Design a protein with these regions (language model features):
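Short alpha-helical transmembrane segments in multi-pass integral membrane proteins
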Residues: 2-49, 104-170, 201-204, 210-269, ...
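Helix-terminus/linker motif at the lipid-water interface of multi-pass membrane proteins
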Residues: 51, 55-77, 145-152, 208-215, ...
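Hydrophobic alpha-helical transmembrane bundles that constitute the permease/transmembrane domains
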Residues: 51-62, 85-99, 135, 139, ...
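Membrane-helix interface/capping residues of multi-pass secondary transporters
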Residues: 65, 73-76, 113, 188, ...
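Small-residue hotspots at the loop-to-helix junctions and early N-terminal turns
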Residues: 73-84, 162, 221, 294-309, ...
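Small-residue-rich hydrophobic transmembrane alpha-helices
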Residues: 76-135, 139, 172-191, 299-363, ...
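A late C-terminal transmembrane helix in Major Facilitator Superfamily
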Residues: 393, 407-434
Length: 488
């Protein structure tokens, strides 16, 4: 009986796919003369909960950094040295999860609801298969960190954080897959609810694991793992609830289909590789600053966290682009996808540019919050951080172009060329520039590059150049409309 029901649902999905979906298009408003306009209210109705969800992620990051600062400035620098690299590992190994929002949005726009639920289960199967790889990468902490030449005390702290954080990151990747489903069907408030539960749990467990149990820096990683596990359980309970079972057949599509898994990996791996390449460059950049000294590493980490006030909500707006573009394409309206995508890109760039300036203006009051007054490295870290915030403010508009364009391209399934562009710019432009600008002669990892010795300030000049080039390049890729020839 169940098999026949599944077959019937798949058949209905196939019939629906043959014709564009009827009804109004995503975020579309018709005026009195029948002309179509982008409904700004509809865009914001989707974007604002996603921005709020990103704000919750900011609170999570700030809470973690506050707990690290309570341990020591050295612990703060250690986490900063590996934080980006941890996310890179998750993006590369958890690529199938990042594809969920695109597949769900296009399936939802085409009214293929059971296909949308199937994308979630396929991602969860992929995460289960990849779990041993997460553990192996986590266990290789010393092999991965040794070549970067950290201060021994910083490396020891970073290694203590690395293993539990990476080994348990498959849980976080599974949570991303679940949230991608809710975002793809245009229900970001559910995503927000799951994130609030996870963040509140993480804050409580940080205090318990780090200080009361005495686990130190590793306790923060374990707190994140446990909190994400509870968030995953909560999201699954919602996904398998009566409403989703009735419309999406979420309880019927759990069986693994190899063809779907391969398709999702082909889409998800380059989709994960694009931000992974970007963050890999930032991870290496962060390690350069930590290699220079505790003050530079800590200042860079604090600035990164503060600029997330622009980045994370900007990511929320851009995520709305993935959903709106994907749903429009699923409905057979690629021209409308172009219009609504450009509106999202503009909103993202303007928001991030404005917030970047406000953060720099508020730096003198905010920076001291992240360091302990008793710490000898606190004062130089704060002084350097104030200068770095203005450099960071300079690239926020272009980072908005980068985020908005990349997420809209993701909604269209255009992921391979953008991944190659980001990989090339990150490793062939950004990393060499950061090395040349940061290190003086004899300080760096290699000797064949110019070594100007501008320190952390020089490294952030390289960030400014890189983001300006990257944002412009991806925006031109979107404007080229090459994505309109892609069919998933």
């Amino acid at each position: 009986m169940r098999e026949s029901l599944i077959a019937q649902n798949v058949a209905m999905d196939s019939i629906t796919r043959l014709a564009p979906a009827a009804g109004p298009l995503p975020a579309q408003r018709l005026d009195e003369s029948g002309r179509a306009h982008v409904d700004q209210r509809a865009v914001l109705a989707l974007a604002l909960p996603l921005m709020a969800n990103s704000a919750v992620q900011i609170i999570l990051n700030l809470t973690d950094m506050w707990f690290m600062g309570r341990i020591s400035t050295r612990a703060l620098a250690a986490v900063g040295a590996v934080q980006w690299l941890v996310i890179v590992a998750v993006l590369v190994l958890g690529g199938a999860g990042t594809a969920v929002q695109t597949l769900v949005a296009q399936a939802y726009g085409a009214r293929r609801y059971h296909r949308a639920a199937q994308a979630v289960w396929t991602a969860l199967w992929a995460m289960a298969c990849a779990a041993p790889l997460f553990v192996l990468v986590g266990a290789a902490r010393h092999l991965i960190l040794a070549p970067f030449g950290f201060d021994p005390a910083v490396e020891q702290l970073a290694a203590a954080f690395w293993f539990p954080r990476v080994a348990g990151a498959c849980i976080g990747a599974a949570v991303w897959a679940m949230l991608g489903f809710f975002n793809g069907i245009g229900r970001p408030r559910t995503t927000l609810l799951v994130s609030i539960v996870t963040t509140a749990t993480n804050a409580v467990l940080n205090q318990e694991f780090i200080f009361r149990l005495g686990w130190g820096i590793a306790g923060s990683a374990w707190a994140t793992n446990v909190a994400q596990f509870l968030g995953l359980a909560f999201a699954l309970a919602l996904f398998l609830g009566p409403g989703y079972r009735a419309r999406f057949g979420s309880h019927l599509t759990w069986r693994l289909q190899r063809s779907r898994l391969v398709q999702q990996l082909r889409l998800g791996v380059p989709m994960g590789l694009s931000p992974a390449a970007d963050l890999l460059g930032f991870a290496i950049f962060q390690m350069m600053q930590t290699r220079l000294g505790t003050a530079g590493g800590a200042a860079t980490q604090i600035v990164v966290i503060l600029t997330s006030l622009a980045y994370m909500p900007g990511f929320g707006i851009a995520s709305a682009g993935t959903t709106l573009v994907g749903q429009s394409i699923g409905a057979g309206a690629r021209g409308w996808a172009q219009r609504v995508g450009e509106r999202v890109i503009l909103l993202t760039a303007c928001y991030m540019g404005g917030i970047g300036v406000l953060i720099a203006l508020g730096g003198p009051w905010v920076l001291p919050f992240f360091t302990g007054a008793h710490d000898a490295d606190a004062r130089p870290a704060i002084a350097l951080g104030m200068r770095l915030l203005w450099l960071a403010a300079g690239y926020q508009f272009f980072d908005g172009l980068n985020l908005g364009a990349s997420m809209c391209l993701r909604g269209a399934g255009d992921v391979r060329v953008p991944a190659l562009l980001v990989l090339g710019l990150s490793l062939l432009l950004f990393v060499p520039l950061a090395h040349a600008f940061t290190f003086a002669r004899g300080e760096g990892w290699v000797g064949f590059l110019p070594q100007l010795g501008w320190g952390a300030f020089g490294g952030w000049i390289a960030v400014l150049i890189y983001i300006m080039v990257l944002g412009t390049t991806l925006f031109l890729r979107w404007r080229s409309r090459a994505w309109q020839r892609i069919h998933l």
